[in-house]
Amino acid sequence: MDSDVENEKMPLLDHLVELRRRLLYSVAGFLVCFFASYYFAADIFNFLLQPLADIWQGDSSRRIIFTAMHEKFFTDIKVAFFAGTFIAFPIIANQIWIFIAPGLYKQEKRAFLPFLVATPFLFFMGGAFVYYFVFPVAWPFFASFEQEGANGAMAIALEPKVNEYLSLVMRLIFAFGLSFELPVVMTLLARARIMTSSSMRKKRRYAILLAFVAAAVLTPPDPLSQIGLALPI
């Protein structure tokens, strides 16, 4: 084996034992983060609700509802799962790195490590973008379709369900988080010589079209959310 590889060649059984150890550490780290997140699930969900609460300030009659006995419980489970996964990602990524690093050349380590660091940071940036810039615009737009009961018309009021609200929020956070990973993907493709800068320029029109198609699929059917996702892509 090349001298740049730090460790000597390991037998297959040793690799399997090491893989099992890293998987156990990853699962243990996730479970700790999951149960900690479940303890704070109500606070996390209230944080996700804040952009909606901001447009209803001063109206104590506003509420979100659940219509099944188990809905709120499983919503808290989902909150804990999403939050636990995000918090545990550095632990899991570190275990992956410990497992694969001994088999990499030094130059491969130097090339790979920045992507491992940039991936969670860019995903967090995407989530922060949708929370602080998209939600404050999209939620008032959706709420504007309410209708007051007057002149014989029925009142139409927005009362979101907790499960549906969480699903929408997490879908948008996931979509924007992935869209912010595009620099990592493009850089990896360029380093692997799958794509070059000239080919990217030639296919720019198709990429723009694909960005808007992806935004239409991943976001609610309103132009504000779709444009908000397509632009970062």
Model-based region annotation:
Residues 1-233:
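Membrane topogenic/interface segments and analogous intrinsically disordered interaction regions
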